[in-house]
Amino acid sequence: MNGTSSPASVPKPSPGAPTRRDFLYVATGTVAAIGAAATLIPLVDQLNPDASTLAQGGPVDLDVGKIQPRQQTIVRWRERPIFVFHRTPKALQALQNEKLLDQLADPRSVERQQPPYADNWHRSAKPEYGILVGICTHLGCIPRFDQLADEAAIVANWPGGYFCPCHGSKYDLAGRVFKGVPAPYNLPVPPYRFTSDTTVRIGENPPNVKFELESVQQI
């Protein structure tokens, strides 16, 4: 891929060691937050976990029933932003459009960036809810959430989704990366499971499923 560092040249950080990716993650947080604020209903305070849960790095419960169609909420898990987007039938239809698939680097999610229960075209346990780690797989910036007014539209080079303001990488609403951008992989999908029809527990797999976020190709 032109202008893209090879996966081997982007090493995974060792636990507890600050890296360039850590710096970019913090430095771009303000920029990403400004972009996200224009598209989010202010649910952050009531949806974020309490301080003790964050400190322990344990699973985080989220009531997705409060997230309206076309709305995205961001929660924190293990100090990472987790994007939770309520996708409409039109958005799901667009994810299967051949014009879109032709623009993607890994449309079938062959690279291991998701748990087995997200090995599908919508990369999720439930099609209507996209749940992604909001960290660009290039150098760790936080992508901006952009969606078109018409979710069914597929325009040249951009059908709406996630755009990284640092170096221009683009992802669709399933977190699949576009061709010809610096990011080498799709956005990771964290471990999670639904404990009820409307409650998702981020950081915990369904019974009898083993998956750790650290096992993906690139965070």
Predicted regions and their residues:
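Non-catalytic localization and substrate-recognition regions of ubiquitin/SUMO ligases
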Residues: 21-25, 51-52
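N-terminal export signals
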Residues: 2-3, 23-44
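Extracytoplasmic/periplasmic/luminal assembly and interaction segments
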Residues: 71-118
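N-terminal secretory signal peptides
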Residues: 1-18
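Short, acidic/polar N-cap/turn motifs at the starts of alpha helices
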Residues: 59, 70-74, 161, 189-191
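Rieske [2Fe-2S] iron-sulfur-binding domain
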Residues: 102-211, 215-219
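Alpha-helical transmembrane signal-anchor/signal-peptide segments
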Residues: 46-61
